[in-house]
From Swiss-Prot:
Species of the source: Bacillus mycoides (strain KBAB4)
Gene3D superfamilies the UniProt entry points to: FMN-linked oxidoreductases (3.20.20.390)
Catalytic activity: sn-glycerol 1-phosphate + all-trans-heptaprenyl diphosphate = 3-heptaprenyl-sn-glycero-1-phosphate + diphosphate
KW Lipid metabolism (keyword) present: yes
Record keywords, A-Z: Lipid biosynthesis, Lipid metabolism, Magnesium, Metal-binding, Phospholipid biosynthesis, Phospholipid metabolism, Transferase
Protein's UniProt name: Heptaprenylglyceryl phosphate synthase
Cofactor(s) needed for function: Mg(2+)
An example Gene Ontology biological process: glycerophospholipid biosynthetic process
Length: 229
């Protein structure tokens, strides 16, 4: 079984976006630690299954980040369940999760499931608008969410999500200093190897997403930049 605590670099693929077979092979054979399948809108069981079957041709670990209960399917190595801690809507903190447990709780393999405490920091991002996230946060606010995830809820992952814009490296550094057991994931705005390397100084896991669809060569260079191999 894979050890997610050792993952330094992951690619995130959106099932609602077009990706050629050639580029998918490049991603899966890049040396990244895992591929996460997830997105904010247009997620269906059909496009999730298509992505799963495509990725399963390769040896890379595969994770489904669940944003729609209707699109859950067996076959992934792990399932990440996001809880948007700074959402104004309880459904995105625990509501959807409660519904999922009502429907699937009896058949869940709990060894495959990890809860993510999300803090969304770009108000323009789809995920911020979907979840009505309160993004105008001070550093103290963000650190309080990190403590909530790490020390009160004992979540395995705290995820700083800048989605579409590059984040504040000092904030990432200070959040990392607060976490004792939760792993820090960083995602958002990484468009080159230099940015990926900078965030990897403090984030346990760097998530690279949108650049895959804009500049595949730059996306691939982030693997070596983060892992130093």
């Amino acid at each position: 079984m894979y050890d997610i605590s050792k993952w330094k670099h992951v690619f995130k693929l959106d099932p609602n976006k077009e990706l050629s077979d050639e580029h998918l092979e490049m991603i899966c054979e890049s040396g990244t630690d895992a591929v996460i399948v997830g997105g904010s809108d247009g997620i269906t069981i059909d496009n999730v299954l298509h992505m799963l079957v495509s990725i399963r041709r390769y040896a890379v670990p595969c994770v489904l980040e669940v944003s729609d209960v209707e699109a859950i399917t067996p076959g992934f190595d792990f399932y990440y369940i996001p809880s948007v801690l700074n959402s104004r809507k309880v459904e995105w903190v625990t509501g959807v999760h409660h519904e999922a447990l009502k429907e699937f709780g009896d058949i869940m393999d709990w060894d495959e499931i990890y809860m993510e405490g999300y803090c969304v920091l770009n108000p323009e991002a789809k995920v911020a608008q979907l979840t009505d996230a309160k993004c105008d946060l001070t550093e103290d606010d963000v650190i309080a969410y990190a403590r909530l995830a790490d020390k009160l809820l004992h979540l395995p992952i705290f995820y700083l999500e800048y989605s579409g814009t590059y984040g504040d490296i000092e904030l990432v550094k200070n959040v990392k200093a607060e976490l004792k057991q939760a792993k820090l994931y960083y995602g958002g705005g990484i468009s080159n190897a230099e940015q990926a390397k900078e965030m990897a100084q403090y984030a346990d896991t760097v998530v690279v997403g949108n650049i895959i669809y804009d500049d595949i060569k730059s996306a691939l260079k982030t693997v070596k930049a983060v892992k130093g191999e």
